[in-house]
C-alpha cells in the first residue's frame, strides 16, 4: 500500500492553492445557485467573481478593478460584466522587499524564483471563474509582454497595470 499523504519537513512551509481554488469555488457556488433556479447572480470569493445575468437594475454587473497599491483600495477601472468569470492577480498584497527589490509571492516556474517584472496587476475576463483565476496567475507569472501574447492566443479579455516610475500604465488585450 502506498501512502499518498503530503508531508513537510519545515513547519513554516505551506502550499497556497488560492491561485486556482477561489475561482473553482466561485463556479461551484454558481452551479448550486443555477440548480436552485437562480439565473441572475454575482458570486465573489476573495475578489474572484462570476457574474451571470443582470443586476437588480437590469444592467450588467459593475466590477471595480483595484489600483495595485498595498496601502489603499482605490478603483482604477470599472467594468460591466454579464455571464463571465473575473479574476485579478497582482504583486501588491503578498510580497516582500529586500535591498530595494520587490519579490512577489508568484513564482516563475522556469527559474523557481519569485517574479520581478513590472506587471503589478492583471485582470482576466473568461467564460468561467476557474479559467479567469488560473489564467490571471499564469499571465502574472509570464509578465506583460508574454502575458499579452498568451491572452491574444487564447482570445481572453485581459487588463494590465504595469509599473511606470511612480505610477502605472494601462493596456489591454483586444478581447477586453
Give the ranges of each region predicted by the language model:
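Mature catalytic core of soluble alpha/beta enzymes
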Residues: 1-176
Amino acid at each position: 500500500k502506498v501512502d499518498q499523504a503530503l508531508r513537510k519537513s519545515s513547519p513554516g512551509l505551506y502550499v497556497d492553492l488560492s491561485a486556482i481554488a477561489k475561482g473553482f469555488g466561485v463556479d461551484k457556488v454558481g452551479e448550486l445557485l443555477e440548480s436552485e433556479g437562480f439565473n441572475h447572480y454575482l458570486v465573489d470569493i476573495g475578489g474572484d467573481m462570476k457574474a451571470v445575468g443582470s443586476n437588480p437594475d437590469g444592467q450588467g454587473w459593475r466590477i471595480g478593478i483595484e489600483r495595485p497599491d498595498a496601502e489603499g483600495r482605490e478603483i482604477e477601472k470599472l467594468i460591466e460584466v454579464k455571464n463571465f468569470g473575473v479574476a485579478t492577480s497582482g504583486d501588491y498584497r503578498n510580497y516582500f522587499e529586500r535591498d530595494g527589490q520587490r519579490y512577489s509571492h508568484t513564482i516563475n516556474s522556469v527559474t523557481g524564483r519569485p517574479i520581478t517584472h513590472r506587471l503589478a496587476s492583471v485582470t482576466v475576463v473568461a467564460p468561467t471563474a476557474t479559467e479567469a483565476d488560473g489564467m490571471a496567475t499564469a499571465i502574472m507569472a509570464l509578465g506583460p509582454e508574454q502575458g499579452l501574447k498568451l491572452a491574444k492566443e487564447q482570445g481572453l479579455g485581459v487588463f494590465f497595470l504595469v509599473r511606470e516610475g511612480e505610477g502605472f500604465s494601462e493596456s489591454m488585450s483586444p478581447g477586453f
